[in-house]
């Protein structure tokens, strides 16, 4: 499973990219607004920090506006993936942009039917929102499993990009359910490495090495 980081903080992206564990980045207008910087400037800087896909979202909701903004975003860098909302206008724009060779991430997916439509529209990625489904007491992981089965049944190439990831347990369950990609905030990705027994074991090893005077 590929790991994308969900942030517009370029320092966080640079730090995580240096680990070699990050395969791409997802952003949205809300995340970029927090930076207080011009939209295109932030996207360009992020694209320079990773070779992987960088999702940049349109703010238009009509077909012509999405096409205009999508083409503008795609010109920022070769690794930009245009992020579109899961609406009929968004799916129409998805079909048109992907036909032109532009990668598209269809976002705000909350049902298997929506995911099926996105795949038929040629989406590069579909982003089901796990945490937001949990908020309304619907099992987001069941949705991942349903999408996985449908895509496998019909050999769709659209990748399942699990979003709204809020905990290490979400990451584990997405991997078990067959998500191709998960995107999570930097804090969640960093928390994946932690385990109390790892910390305890390391503490013991270091104490024993110091006691024995071991140097490498």
Curated annotation (Swiss-Prot):
The keyword Cytoplasm applies. It is an enzyme of class 2 (transferase). Keywords: Cytoplasm, Pentose shunt, Schiff base, Transferase. It catalyses: D-sedoheptulose 7-phosphate + D-glyceraldehyde 3-phosphate = D-erythrose 4-phosphate + beta-D-fructose 6-phosphate. Pathway: Carbohydrate degradation; pentose phosphate pathway; D-glyceraldehyde 3-phosphate and beta-D-fructose 6-phosphate from D-ribose 5-phosphate and D-xylulose 5-phosphate (non-oxidative stage): step 2/3. GO terms for biological process: carbohydrate metabolic process; pentose-phosphate shunt. InterPro entries: Aldolase_TIM, TAL/FSA, Transaldolase_3B, Transaldolase_3B/F6P_aldolase, Transaldolase_AS, TSA/FSA_arc/bac. The active site is at residue 83. Its EC number is 2.2.1.2. It is found in: Cytoplasm. GO terms for molecular function: aldehyde-lyase activity; transaldolase activity. One of its GO terms (cellular component) is cytoplasm. It comes from the Bacteria. Pfam families: TAL_FSA (PF00923). Belongs to the transaldolase family. Type 3B subfamily. Transaldolase is important for the balance of metabolites in the pentose-phosphate pathway. This is Probable transaldolase. The lineage of its organism: Bacteria, Pseudomonadati, Pseudomonadota, Alphaproteobacteria, Hyphomonadales. The gene is tal.
